[in-house]
Amino acid sequence: MYHGMNPSNGDGFLEQQQQQQQPQSPQRLLAVILWFQLALCFGPAQLTGGFDDLQVCADPGIPENGFRTPSGGVFFEGSVARFHCQDGFKLKGATKRLCLKHFNGTLGWIPSDNSICVQEDCRIPQIEDAEIHNKTYRHGEKLIITCHEGFKIRYPDLHNMVSLCRDDGTWNNLPICQGCLRPLASSNGYVNISELQTSFPVGTVISYRCFPGFKLDGSAYLECLQNLIWSSSPPRCLALEVCPLPPMVSHGDFVCHPRPCERYNHGTVVEFYCDPGYSLTSDYKYITCQYGEWFPSYQVYCIKSEQTWPSTHETLLTTWKIVAFTATSVLLVLLLVILARMFQTKFKAHFPPRGPPRSSSSDPDFVVVDGVPVMLPSYDEAVSGGLSALGPGYMASVGQGCPLPVDDQSPPAYPGSGDTDTGPGESETCDSVSGSSELLQSLYSPPRCQESTHPASDNPDIIASTAEEVASTSPGIDIADEIPLMEEDP
């Protein structure tokens, strides 16, 4: 793109000179051609004088930030030089100049003033923490920018919130994007910000710390507020009085809080402790550094303990011993229980317990009377032959309380009884029967001889049922055989 300026109405003389010189241009061209031909024929040395007699205009020059056409050569009378500017610049002066003869006969440029190129657009300004929206700005245009988050636009002239592009390519009232300014740092402390950072966006929080031996006076944290000022003034680091070395303790030592303790500054806490086997004389084991002095100010002592506590290793061994003893005891108890159970099982196998009478009639059974085993009849034998062996006289004696059998019957003869009278022999025989019955009752639970107390006038059915009970509840027992065995010698 080329920018130029058309000649104004005041250049009438220039136009008149152009019109006068137009017919002479071919003549001048012919003269130059003729001169070059003569130079070729006779040599340049012989024509030097003639070349010097030729008149030309001086070089008009090339404007800065622009260019000219033609860019070089010899400018004879009637020559024209045209000027142009680069992008972003505009031409100040004539766009073309003519080489003409003045009234005194010399050649010169008309107009005589040199043309220059001046900046046409304002360059994009470099503003930190900002975004420039337009890329080109011409004369009179307004700058449009947006600040980054946390920063706000500020103009030098608070009454004029506009920045315009001047005709000379510069800006007036150029703004900046500003945050909170860099706060001051204490000489005895430091702050967690970069040394190169000069502005901080809204919401930034910075922290202050003091060197050892100094105390922070003020807020340790500062925040950049919406009005672009800090939440409080920067704190100071004040020197503190340092406490001397804590008192030494025999058979003990101390630790400080917080660790490590390079210097015992104000607020440092020291905790005392004793070696193993020793204990403090006082329950209070802390002292605090306050303004260069330890508080409370007392001497700490460690004395030998009367009771020595086992070490961790010994305590661990004791614990394992208890656990092992308990486990061994439990295992032994379980083993004894298992052995007892096995022994009980084997014992039952060799000595089976007495139970109810066997249901099978073929299994033999016996009783021991005075050390002599007596085989008992089976149940079937006792039922079928028991009553027939006793005879009718015995059934009557059972109903009448064991009297002597009747005269027409032949009862079995009892040893030791020679007469058949109903005298003392009767009671002895009944007692013998009673004794045998008691023995049988203890083994097989037969009915007692209380049935003999019933009178003879009772119902015969009761007597018959009693006899059946004796026979049924005493299987395999022969009453006639048992009574002589139980009878004592007179």
Curated annotation (Swiss-Prot):
TM region positions: 320-340
Protein name: Sushi domain-containing protein 4
Keyword Membrane: yes
Signal peptide bounds: 1-41
Residues in the Cytoplasmic compartment per record: 341-490
PROSITE patterns per record: SUSHI
Source species: Homo sapiens
One Pfam entry name: Sushi
Tissue specificity remark: Isoform 3 is the predominant isoform in all tissues except cortex, cerebellum, kidney, and breast. Isoform 1 is found primarily in the esophagus and the brain.
Domain Sushi positions: 55-119, 120-179, 178-239, 241-304
GO cellular component, one term: parallel fiber to Purkinje cell synapse
This protein's encoding gene: SUSD4
Residue numbers on the Extracellular membrane side: 42-319
Keyword set includes Transmembrane helix: yes
Superkingdom classification of source: Eukaryota
